[in-house]
Regions:
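Beta-strand/loop substructures that line and gate deep hydrophobic ligand-binding cavities in soluble
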Residues: 81-133, 140
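Hydrophobic/aromatic beta-strand elements that line small-molecule binding cavities or substrate pockets
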Residues: 7-9, 61-68, 79, 89-97
């Protein structure tokens, strides 16, 4: 059984600007309240090192592998806890052009594995609010002149 989370925000910025903010991992400590630290590059096959601070939860470090990096459109990675099939999270950031100088940033994550059903309530309580906080913070940063 899979668990899915979804959060989106409309941003008055170009897809290029949103992509720039999203993939400037070194700057995450300056603005991102959810993924408070990130190292690596947005390149397929790259293994990132991310520090996540779930809302009301304990911080964890995880090492997702970039599956897709389509500039100005999509960044997708896969993180695993312990081993494949235990608790896997495939996270996608999609940038959609809306016109009139706006884009929509959509975060979507699908969790699978033996622990996914057991973690469902915790993901709703701690992780989804983190997505929403990150979206709002990214919006503020991308809309700055």
């Amino acid at each position: 059984m899979a668990k899915q989370l979804h959060a989106q925000v409309d941003i008055r910025a170009t897809p290029e600007r949103v992509w720039e903010v999203l993939t400037d991992f070194a700057a995450y400590p300056e603005w991102n309240p959810f993924i408070t630290e990130a190292r690596g590059t947005a390149r397929v096959g790259e293994r990132l090192t991310n520090r996540m601070q779930p809302v009301g939860g304990r911080g964890i470090t995880f090492r997702p592998t970039v599956l897709e990096a389509d500039p100005r459109r999509r960044l997708r990675w896969l993180g695993r806890l312990v081993a494949p099939g235990i608790f896997d999270g495939e996270h996608t950031f999609t940038i959609q052009q809306l016109g009139d100088g706006q884009v929509r940033l959509v975060q979507h994550e699908q969790f699978r594995g033996l622990l996914a059903p057991l973690m469902a309530k915790s993901l709703d309580r701690h992780t989804l609010p983190g997505f929403e906080l990150m979206n709002q913070a990214l919006k503020r940063r991308a809309e700055q002149p």
